[in-house]
Amino acid sequence: MNYSLAVDIGASSGRLIVGECNKKIQLTEIHRFENQIIEKNGQFCWDVDALFSEIKTGLKKCREAGIEPVSMGIDTWAVDFVLLDEHDKPLTDAVSYRDPRTDGVMEEVIEQFMKERLYLETGIQFQQFNTIYQLYALKKQHPDIFKKAKSFLMIPDYFHFLLTGKKANEYTNATTTQLVNAFTKKWDKDIIEALGFNPDMFQEIKLPTESLGKLKSEWVEEVGFDLEVILPATHDTGSAVVAVPKVADTIYLSSGTWSLIGVENSFPICVTKALDYNFTNEGGMNYQFRFLKNIMGLWMIQEVRRNYDNRYSFAQLVELSKGISFKSTVDVNDPRFLKPTNMIKEIQRYCQETGQQAPELPGEVAKCVFESLAESYTSAVAEIEDIFEKDFKSINVIGGGCRNELLNQLIADRTKKDVFAGPIEATAIGNLVAQWMALGEIESIQQARKLIYDSFDVKRYVSADRE
């Protein structure tokens, strides 16, 4: 039996999961670790050295368990990057999208380009932390450093480079930069050059299932075995959507630190209505498009828990919020919730400023977050149906957030649609599917989705009005 290894690193945690593909998919978690933003040199950064060390730790644990995967691939969150100098050394820390360096930058870039033009060419949602604005901020604030940049690698590209010595920009993650043309599927040199970016620092765009080759000899010696590094959809949501068991007449909701809600489509939708609703057309497997909206997600409850000094588990916060009729809600996409000093106080201030009852008890704060998320999902569903001029029958929640039964039921109640929850490890599964397709163990995404449907439990939630 051949094993493959998915390295799935989210904005709050990472895991290494070994998968076997036979009549059913079997998963074994090998290693799990935390991922936290650190403050360094006055900026919010990712500790990429520590993350790479965790990847190597997971590989060593494979060997210790008597498991030697034949392949591996890495996925992470989107938009963040590492710039390398002429010696292939990082020029700066890996600054997080939550850093305020991009405050006001998006508006400055839009002044140079008509908003409609940027959207028509890239199809990407306008968010202040998109890569395009991070690069522009770096160029403006540290021009000397920016001029030295010879290679642009997104976070998973950088880890793949460290493992193999091969540089490439994987397609699904590259599209989130707002610098890839949605129709040519190549770097948009007109935009890149107009903003004063060096087009030569961007690498060849490669597709999921393409191989980067074997590990560098130093890592083979350290971890004790060799394997093939195969590109998955390196944007975690891109991998997660591959694992949606059924996509016909279904809206997917990838629920984690971020919530990404949308549909799979064969072409980009760059119409005015999609721009007005602020939807994005991110690249997917096989040049499919993930037409979706980014919503703040479970980051808010993660921060609430942290503000309570981790006295409550996530399950306890859910339990405390059950049976509470607290109805105050906040706009979860308000930038004030991106990186507040204290999430609980920010939620309370928002409620006070909007004339609503401010939550006080932990259960009330949690219920406010869950109700607010469900409300934002419901609005996004209505917008999707307006754009497509059709009703979708169901919503499939995937990722870690699908374990939140209270939130799943709130979504069903508010949208009046059937909600299906699972699989939980959708991202790792989608990552593995790309590897198995490259290795010839799975022929198509359609075959993979049937296999996923047969392999994992999916729970159904029905609106209370329809029970």
From Swiss-Prot:
GO function terms (MF aspect): ATP binding; glycerol kinase activity; rhamnulokinase activity
Disulfide bonds: 351-368
Matching SUPFAM superfamilies: Actin-like ATPase domain
Cofactor(s) needed: Mg(2+)
KW Magnesium (keyword) present: yes
Top-level enzyme category: transferase
UniProt superkingdom: Bacteria
Listed InterPro entries: ATPase_NBD, Carb_kinase_FGGY, FGGY_C, FGGY_N, Rhamnulokinase
Residues annotated to bind ATP: 11-15, 257, 302, 400
Catalytic residue list: 236
One Gene Ontology cellular component annotation held by this UniProt entry: cytosol
Catalytic activity reported: L-rhamnulose + ATP = L-rhamnulose 1-phosphate + ADP + H(+)
Residues bound to substrate: 78, 235-237, 294
Positions of transmembrane segments: none
Record EC number: 2.7.1.5
Entry-linked Pfam families: FGGY_C, FGGY_N
Alphabetic keyword roster: ATP-binding, Disulfide bond, Kinase, Magnesium, Nucleotide-binding, Rhamnose metabolism, Transferase
Biological pathway: Carbohydrate degradation; L-rhamnose degradation; glycerone phosphate from L-rhamnose: step 2/3
Swiss-Prot/TrEMBL GO biological process terms: glycerol metabolic process; rhamnose catabolic process
Protein's job: Involved in the catabolism of L-rhamnose (6-deoxy-L-mannose). Catalyzes the transfer of the gamma-phosphate group from ATP to the 1-hydroxyl group of L-rhamnulose to yield L-rhamnulose 1-phosphate.
NCBIfam families in the record: rhamnulo_kin
Family: Belongs to the rhamnulokinase family.
Name of protein: Rhamnulokinase
Organism: Halalkalibacterium halodurans (strain ATCC BAA-125 / DSM 18197 / FERM 7344 / JCM 9153 / C-125)
